[in-house]
Amino acid sequence: MDKQIIKNIIIEKQIAIPNYKLVHRDFLFGDKSNYILVGIRRAGKSYLLYQDIQTRLNRGEQSAQDILYINFEDERLSSLKAEELGTILDSYMELYPGKQPFVYLDEIQNIEGWEKFARRLADSQYRVMITGSNAKMLGKEMFSTLGGRYIPKEIFPFSFAEYLTYHQVEPGENWEYNQQIKSIISNYFDSYFYEGGIAESFEQPDKREYLNVLYQKILIGDIVERNSIRNSRIFRFLAKKLADSVMQPSSLTRLQHMVKSTGDTISLPALKDYLEYMQDAYLFFPIPNLVSPMTEQATLQKRYVADNGILNLFLFQGETKLLENMVAIELNRRFRNTTEETLLYYFNKNVEIDFCVPSAQLAIQVSYNLNDEATYEREVGGLIKFLKAFPGYHGYIITRDYQTQIMADGYTIEVVPIWKWLLQDNN
C-alpha cells in the first residue's frame, strides 16, 4: 500500500474533523478505554468518533496532529489487506516521529482479519476507537480474538429526544403543561414518526429517496455481496415480507411457504442464514415469545425494522405498524445489552401482550387509539389478565395521542401518548 496515500488521508482528516458541525449525543467514553461501536449504517457511529475527537481538542487533551483517523470506506483504501494495516501506523510515524496518536478506525469490518491489528494496538497501549456495521463484531469469537481489550457499544439512530436536540428544541421541566412547547414537540414528532432517526436524512431535500438509497446499500452492499447471496430476488422478497408483518410472529416454516408461493424455493438452513444476515446488518431485530421453549424462541419471533424511516418505505397508510415498530425500537434502545441475554419479549399464551420486559417488570400494549369498545376490551382486558398472572408487573398502553389512567379490578394501567413516553425516563 502506498504510504503517501495514507499520509494524505491522515492529514485531510486532521484538518477536516475539528471543523465538522455536530449535534452532541449523550455518550461518555472513558479516557483510557478502547471501544467498538456497532450499529446500522448511518446510525451516527462516525459522528461519535468526531465528537470524541472534538471533545479532546476542546479540552486541550490532544492536538490535531495526535489524530489518526482512517475511514475504510475511502475508495483509495479499497485494495488494503489485513497484513498491510501496520502501514497505517508506519505512515503516521513518518509524519510525526515519536508521537503516539489516538487511533480511530471507521468501518474496519471491510478488512477481513482486522482483529489482530486491533489487538496489537491495544496491547501496545494505544487508545483506539473502532466502528462497524455488522453485529458479528460483538460476537463471542470476536471477543475471544480481541481478548477483552475493547468495550462494545451498540449505536442506534437518533432517539426522539436527540431528534429534538438536533432541531434545537429543549422541552425543559414540566414541558407537558406548556401548550406552546407541546405543540412544537407534536409537530416535530409527526416528522420523526414517518421519517425516523437517521441523522443524515434530516437535511436531505428528498428524505424518502435518501432512505431508499441507504436501504439498498445495506441490502446489497452489507448483506447480499458480503455474504455472497446468489438469489437476491428471494432475499428482497423476504425483507419486504418481514417489513409488512412487523406486528406478527413469523416462523421459519411460514416464511418458507411465502417464498414457495412466488415460485422460488429455499431450504430452512438457508432461510435461517438469510434472517441472521439481516440481523447482523442491523436491518431487523428479533423479539422472542417469553413463554416459548428455547427452540421456539429462536424460530417463532417478531421482527422489527431498525428505523421507522426505512420501514415506511414499504408501507401505505401503515400508521399502526409504524407505532408498534417505534415502541419496539425504543424498548430495544433502553433494554438491549451486548451480551447474548435476551431482555425484551412479547407474550402469547392465553393472552397476547405486545412487549414484556421481565427485568423491569413492564407489560406494554400498543394501540393507535382506544376509540372502539372491542379495541378497549382487547387491550385493557389482556393487560389485566396478564397482571393477575404476573404480580408486580406495571401495565402500560402506548397510543398515538390518547392519555388517561385506567383503574380496573384493582389494577392501574397508564395510557400514554408515544411522543410523551419517548421523552420519559427509562422506566
Task: Give, region by region, the residue ranges found by the protein language model.
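Pre-Walker A adenine-sensing motif
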Residues: 13-32
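Conserved lysine of the Walker
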Residues: 45-46
